[in-house]
UniProtKB/Swiss-Prot annotation:
Keyword S-adenosyl-L-methionine: no
GO cellular component, one term: cytosol
Quaternary context: Homodimer.
Key word Ligase present: yes
Family, per entry: Belongs to the class-II aminoacyl-tRNA synthetase family. ProS type 1 subfamily.
GO MF entries: aminoacyl-tRNA deacylase activity; ATP binding; proline-tRNA ligase activity
A Pfam cross-reference name: HGTP_anticodon
Domain of life: Bacteria
UniProt-recorded name of the protein: Proline--tRNA ligase
Subcellular location(s) per record: Cytoplasm
First-level EC class: ligase
Protein's organism: Variovorax paradoxus (strain S110)
Classification lineage: Bacteria, Pseudomonadati, Pseudomonadota, Betaproteobacteria, Burkholderiales
Gene: proS
Length: 581
């Protein structure tokens, strides 16, 4: 491709609403253009990157035995009503009506449609396993679209769906997809981690997220430097502390803490470590009548160490809270504690509550908690002496750096990541809702076991940029670059020798199958170099009259600070060697 025929459009300044590097650089490099909130046009330069992502994903999906199809972007609501998602999903699901007042949705995923295909087409165990995938536009009406392609409303996604005869076979399909994902992200040349993720009601280790490592990532990735353990924050287990609980050493006292309503403020006032305080979180579960209407509520008190944060996914696995919970209302809090939030605790309750303590709190002695009286806290609190042992003990918190690794091979560290892929065993949720069955060897109908596997096609380039950029612009890995090599002739419009040499090298690289661009726009060297450094083409060759007289060209990788002189006759072989590195 020649630059004069292509569309190169760069900006000196990023739009004011671009908050992260990928958004700023993709806009400045002319890769995307904002059309509306969370909606972007993929400009020619950006589309080339997206097509390269799609090509690698498609190759590896086909290699893994998945079969490509394309499902409609606009789908009849009746399928979504079968599974209940039409009503259960919030405003993220875009619902529309046609001229006949029939309901439709704009797909965010396609479980319903692919399950409908399976129930019509898969009759026998002999047809299994099957794995269908598509690379298709999706729409999710995000409340706060931001960060460009990282969290847009319209996006391109690869979504795959496997169908198997039983859970063991589904696990095999899952593993094949997880292996394919590792090959995909290895080929992209990105630093990533595959981390265990929460698998919901299915249980087991049947869910993994693929996270590109980036300081600006929204997700916390927990890992052990001394082993292969990695999980997302929702999944990472906080082990029970080793050793017995210390003996009580302090008397129980009611201590004035005027105006100090947070654990941090109380610890500072009393001159004690934050880890000696205990925070009280009040939840509620609704009690329903036979018709399913709320007729009352059960109030719960969760106790966590003051320097720890509650993990809602873990809390949702506590017996009694696993059917759904909410934060208690102020009226419920006052009814049970007789006090406003900020001074709550497990002592001196007006009405009984169900008490759940985090594992860490169970081994604490002489701790500090609210006195259920404004401007007062209780100090020197001890289990057994001052209050009964809790009804339930569970892992309720997010892990922190330095916690023991669940695999026993060291301590945990935490880094940031951007989720670009997810593999997950669905089980029979959708097949039961939509009656998707097959006949086994005995001729008996069985529900299909399903898995789903997603990759954010348009999110991935943004994640790659967050990991690979500098003050000059993007630094693409070879596999993702819009062009792999750019030939930059200086004074091509004035020097026949430079023009001939540039055209010859361009044709030579094209013939060798290199994705090369010749910049024949006649730009000044500084402007030309700045454009390609911003756009992030990884390999640059500069041709000049002076260099030709010396029999040399200048090569520079995008990560290099200086150019390397290379004999003109061997430049193609030199570049090929760089590809192999």
């Amino acid at each position: 491709m020649k630059a004069s025929r292509f569309f190169v459009s760069t900006l000196k300044e990023a739009p004011a609403d671009a908050e992260v590097a990928s958004h700023r650089l993709m806009m400045r490099a002319g890769m995307i253009k904002k059309l509306g909130t969370g909606i972007y046009t993929y400009m020619p330069m950006g589309l080339r990157v997206i097509r390269k992502v799609e090509a690698i994903v498609r190759e590896e999906m086909n290699r893994a035995g998945a079969v490509e199809l394309t499902m409609p972007v606009v789908q009849p609501a009746e399928f979504w009503q079968e599974t209940g998602r039409f009503d259960k999903m919030g405003p993220e699901l875009l619902r529309i009506k046609d001229r006949h007042d029939r309901d439709f949705v704009v797909q965010p995923t396609s479980e319903e449609v692919v399950t409908d295909i399976a129930r019509q087409e898969i009759r026998s165990y002999k047809q299994l396993p099957k794995n269908f995938y598509q690379i298709q536009t999706k729409f999710r009406d995000e409340r706060r679209p931001r960060f460009g392609l990282m969290r847009g409303r319209e996006f391109i996604m690869k979504d795959a769906y496997s169908f198997d005869r039983d859970l063991d076979a589904a696990k095999a399909s899952y593993q094949a997809m997880a292996d394919a994902y590792r090959r995909i992200f290895d080929r992209f040349g990105l630093r990533y981690r595959a981390v265990a993720a929460d698998s919901g009601a299915i249980g087991g280790d049947l869910s993994e997220e693929f996270q590109v490592i980036a300081a600006t990532g929204e997700d916390a990735i927990v890992y052990c430097p001394g082993s292969d353990y990695a999980a997302n924050m929702e999944k990472a287990e906080a082990l029970a502390p080793a050793g017995p609980r210390p003996a009580a050493a302090k008397a129980l006292e009611k201590t004035p803490t005027p105006g100090k309503s947070t654990c941090a403020d109380v610890a500072e006032l009393l001159g004690v470590p934050l880890s000696t305080t205990v925070k009280s979180l009040v939840l509620a579960t609704d009690i329903l009548d036979e018709a399913g209407n709320p007729k009352g509520s059960q109030v719960w008190l969760l106790l966590l160490r003051g320097d720890h944060d509650m993990n809602e996914i873990k809390v949702g696995k506590v017996p009694g809270l696993d059917k759904g919970f909410r934060f208690a209302t102020l009226a419920e809090i006052d009814d049970h504690f007789g006090c406003k939030p900020g001074y709550l605790g497990p002592l001196n309750l007006k009405k009984p509550v169900r008490l759940v303590a985090d594992r860490e709190v169970m081994v604490m002695a002489d701790w500090i908690t609210g006195a259920n009286e404004v401007d007062f806290h209780m100090t020197g609190v001890n289990w057994g002496r001052d209050l009964p042992e809790p009804e339930l003990v569970a892992d309720l918190r997010n892990v922190v750096a330095g916690d023991a690794s669940p695999d026993g091979k060291g301590v945990l560290a935490i880094e940031r990541g951007i989720e670009v892929g997810h593999v997950f065993v669905l089980g029979t949720k959708y097949s039961k809702d939509m009656n998707a069955t097959y006949l086994d060897e005995a001729g008996k109908p069985q529900f299909l076991e399903m898995g789903c596997y997603g990759i954010g096609i348009t999110r991935l380039p943004a994640a790659a940029i967050e990991q690979n950029h500098d003050e000059r612009g993007i630094i693409w890995p070879d596999a993702l670059a819009p062009f792999t090599v750019v030939v930059c002739p200086i004074g091509m419009d004035r020097s026949p020798e430079v023009k001939v040499a540039a055209e010859a090298l361009y044709e030579q690289l094209l013939a060798a199958g290199v994705d090369v661009l010749l910049d024949d726009r006649g730009e000044r060297p500084g402007a030309m170099f700045a454009d390609w450094e911003l756009i992030g083409v990884p390999h640059r060759v500069v041709i000049s009259d002076r260099g030709l007289k010396e029999g040399q060209l200048e090569y520079q990788h995008r990560r290099d600070t200086a150019a390397t002189k290379v004999p003109a006759a061997g430049i193609a072989e030199f570049i090929a060697g760089k590809f192999a590195q």
